[in-house]
Swiss-Prot record:
Its biological purpose: Catalyzes the formation of pyridoxal 5'-phosphate from ribose 5-phosphate (RBP), glyceraldehyde 3-phosphate (G3P) and ammonia. The ammonia is provided by the PdxT subunit. Can also use ribulose 5-phosphate and dihydroxyacetone phosphate as substrates, resulting from enzyme-catalyzed isomerization of RBP and G3P, respectively.
KW Coiled coil (keyword) present: no
Enzyme superclass (EC): lyase
Name assigned to this protein: Pyridoxal 5'-phosphate synthase subunit PdxS
Stored Gene3D superfamilies: Aldolase class I
NCBIfam families reported in the protein's UniProt record: PRK04180.1, pyridoxal 5'-phosphate synthase lyase subunit PdxS
Gene this protein is translated from: pdxS
Organism: Dehalococcoides mccartyi (strain ATCC BAA-2266 / KCTC 15142 / 195) (Dehalococcoides ethenogenes (strain 195))
Coiled-coil segments: none
Amino acid sequence: METGTFKVKSGLAQMLKGGVIMDVTTPEQAKIAEEAGACAVMALERVPSDIRAAGGVARMADPTIIEKIMKVVSIPVMAKCRIGHFVEAQILESMGVDYIDESEVLTPADESFHVWKHDFKVPFVCGCRDLGEALRRIGEGAAMIRTKGEAGTGNIVEAVRHMRSVMGSVRRVQSMSADELSAYAKEINAPLELVLELHKTGKLPVVNFAAGGVATPADAALMMQLGADGVFVGSGIFKSSDPAAMAKAVVKAVTHYKDAKVLAEISKGLGDAMPGLDIKQIEPDKLISRRGW
């Protein structure tokens, strides 16, 4: 089988469907995530809330940290590169990471272009706020899409906004007549062939995860009920008062997202969730979700 084709890469991402991907900064955290049932881990130097607090320029993690995490877990390991920084992506691919997240959580390296992901054999995940952004990233070769949300806030409101926007637009495309599709593709600045495919199949050609602000099992279940294929949890696990318990509860919430009784049971006794931020109190130029185009 030919490796590195879009079909192969998007197929690999499909294997994560129904799972939880957790941000980790140490091998110990990676083991906690794996034991809790995470389907993959995201290897980082700092979780998004710490990146937000520190300010300055956030770059790809030290390869040593990523390698240490890769050695201790058997589940897939993801790592982040900056938007447009194809050399960071080349480095991560050479290290053998399983997926690369071209992430707005890091400081963008290019304000005009994202990484051309078709040049890589490793699958990429990218964030989006709406259908146009999702289809532009898929057109560049992204094998997996996620909401941007507002990372590091513990506030789910932006992830909800982005998921509702994408899913609402998917339904809108389904209801369009064929002669409307070209104009709509132009309106949302998306590749026409992907809009046509969406109209035909009724769904995105790649998995669509929720990310950015997931802090509780209820948050995770909310995103699943809104149509997410799975959930990324960044600061929400290891900034909570009991990370191991929170990690297990979020995994169960994604599995049993429609069962309110199970959700009530697993939400008991978890201690404090991560401290949250009110999105309205963040200055517009400090909003991470606005990075990317």
